[in-house]
Amino acid sequence: MKKFLPLSISITVLAACSSHTPAPVENAKDLAPSIIKPINGTNSTAWEPQVIQQKMPESMRVPKATNSTYQPEIIQQNQQKTESIAKKQALQNFEIPRDPKTNVPVYSKIDKGFYKGDTYKVRKGDTMFLIAYISGMDIKELATLNNMSEPYHLSIGQVLKIANNIPDSNMIPTQTINESEVTQNTVNETWNANKPTNEQMKPVATPTHSTMPINKTPPATSNIAWIWPTNGKIIQGFSSADGGNKGIDISGSRGQAVNAAAAGRVVYAGDALRGYGNLIIIKHNDSYLSAYAHNESILVKDQQEVKAGQQIAKMGSSGTNTIKLHFXIRYFGQSVD
């Protein structure tokens, strides 16, 4: 039995060695017994291979890890800019309701202040009144914002600033009010456009600092040759009393010609003022305006120059229940007979 003991040990050693992965070698001399060493220098049967470190071949490319370049803030900002541009481009994608015959905007079908852009590109048929109306602004406010003065000349493609997105503490804020207040204030502003301002009413300073009252009574004669705006009977005369008729009402037939009482420039043509129907206001000079209300249809456009006696409308009953023309004259913003 003792003769077989060395053989058993040899088999065990060979089995233990065969269970380990051979260590890498570079040449035959690396097969020397020094490649493997017993742990702690003992004669234990547990063996540990000594691994020889090899360098990666220089010709082999080693992939390098890189960090992500994702930048969510920049992408978000770009998206916001794109959305903003798209929004602005779509803002003017609308049509203004207009009378098919005269091309005059039908303000009763337009929501005051619906346009929310910060700029507006002028299109064919636009007026300062219309742009101010759809932007919820006052005409003077719009003109001041764009450094414009009367007469307001617009050109197609012209870009106007709108006060919707301009944080200016000096800007008068627009208010949400009902349509009757909007139209009354807007047309009254045009109706009173030639009324003297405070600066105009202040006399030139004198050493005694005396003041001179402004005479708002129209002169007995003027350089305007007035003519009757239409034929017919006066069914209601002028009254200076509070709530009185600030003009005259002339009866007639539907479609009868309504003519300019004097030469001038149309400063308003539309139906924004309730109670007056289709209304035309003509500015004759710095002192006088004339108005023509309740027309069946309007034949002139805003800013159009007209001659005395030129037909500007057809008589009708818009804004009332009687076919008539309401005709009125204002001198420095005051109704006169």
From Swiss-Prot:
The keyword Signal applies. Its main location: membrane. One of its GO terms (cellular component) is cell outer membrane. A lipid is attached at C17 (S-diacylglycerol cysteine). Keywords: Cell outer membrane, Lipoprotein, Membrane, Palmitate, Signal, Virulence. It is found in: Cell outer membrane. It is a lipid-anchor. The keyword DNA-binding does not apply. It comes from the Bacteria. InterPro entries: Cell_wall_metabolism_enzyme, Dup_hybrid_motif, LysM_dom, LysM_dom_sf, Peptidase_M23. GO terms for molecular function: metalloendopeptidase activity. Residues 192-215 are annotated as: Disordered. A lipid is attached at C17 (N-palmitoyl cysteine). Residues 118-162 form the LysM domain. May be a virulence determinant. Belongs to the E.coli NlpD/Haemophilus LppB family. This is Outer membrane antigenic lipoprotein B. It comes from Histophilus somni. The lineage of its organism: Bacteria, Pseudomonadati, Pseudomonadota, Gammaproteobacteria, Pasteurellales.
